[in-house]
Design a protein with these regions (language model features):
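Short, surface-exposed coil-to-beta transition loops
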Residues: 23-25, 43-44, 51, 120-124, ...
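Gly/Pro-enriched, hydrophobic low-complexity segments
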Residues: 89-169
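Beta-strand elements of well-folded, non-transmembrane domains
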Residues: 13, 30-32, 115, 131
Length: 169
């Protein structure tokens, strides 16, 4: 099974009533079971780290940590993304109604927030897995306020060594 993966992505974020679009390039690294590094390249230039301790970030001018109980929406959303990318669907079942569909050679997973999950995490997550049944191909995150992020993964390298020091501040 997969123990880690790393590779590029393109993220298109739609925000606000006018649905302004921001397109970013980045790199994702995941070390199972519980470490995610989400890096957006310039001009965004920020790195998010999701670990069991919570959410941390670093950009050109600052860095900080947010404990798991603070900043719930962002931390929970990134934690849900980590769970989806890492295949920890049991964790998601607590807050989402999960469905899976075959689409050609790929599989798509859809997670819609349960009413009991209001105020925590995402409204919906859609996620694609390639024909190898391991490698993610895309994800769509819809926030409770209607903002969304569409992420297309490039060639993800599986089970590559990832420096543990790169997975936290």
């Amino acid at each position: 099974g997969a123990k880690s993966f790393a590779g590029p992505f393109t993220q298109t974020r739609k925000m606000g009533l006018m649905k302004a679009q921001i397109v970013s390039q980045g790199r994702v690294s995941l070390v199972l079971p519980d470490r995610l590094r989400w890096e957006l390249f310039p001009p965004d230039e920020i790195v998010y780290f999701v670990t069991p301790d919570g959410l941390a970030y670093r950009n050109r001018s600052s860095q900080g940590a947010v404990r798991a109980n603070d900043a719930r929406t962002l931390a929970a959303g990134l934690d849900d993304l980590r769970a989806m990318l890492g295949g920890d669907l049991a964790q998601l079942r607590k807050r989402y109604d999960l469905k899976a569909f075959a689409v050609g050679d790929d599989v798509e997973l859809e997670a819609n927030a349960l009413p009991s999950a209001e105020g925590r995490g995402m409204k919906a997550i859609k996620f694609g897995i390639g024909k190898d049944r391991i490698r993610p191909t895309f994800t769509r995150l819809v926030e409770k306020n209607g903002d969304s992020s569409d992420i297309r993964f490039g060639e993800l390298r599986m089970n590559v060594p990832i420096d543990p020091a790169s997975m936290h501040l």
